[in-house]
């Protein structure tokens, strides 16, 4: 919300009033400041359009509560099962507390980072916005010696903005 241009916000199909509100209240020093500005809006729909997925292994409990419908108890449970090795583990553990529909809804807001050289193609496909073709490309260029190699190889298929987004989801041992 701090970096998006007016035209980028409009492309998200949000109301002109909300676009103006966001622009006039920037910069947001934290997600909590942004959340306060959105108090009178349908945050669930908006967050699906603009939310940056949270890393299940590093996000603090307070930030998990920014996910629509996540309260104290569920935020605690998100932290309780760390470290997560896969989205499947998250589904299994959190599925003890909520139904499958709710677990699936949470997947719009979170991710488990993947190790580039060892993660299964299934775990790579669980990353936000990564489909079969991109997951295949991640695997095809193994072994990765460093993140520069990842940037060079995957950068053949996506623009710089998407490459930066994808890099948030991966690491090397």
Cite the ranges covered by each PLM segment.
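Short loop/beta submotifs within extracellular cysteine-rich repeat domains
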Residues: 18, 29-32, 41-42, 74, ...
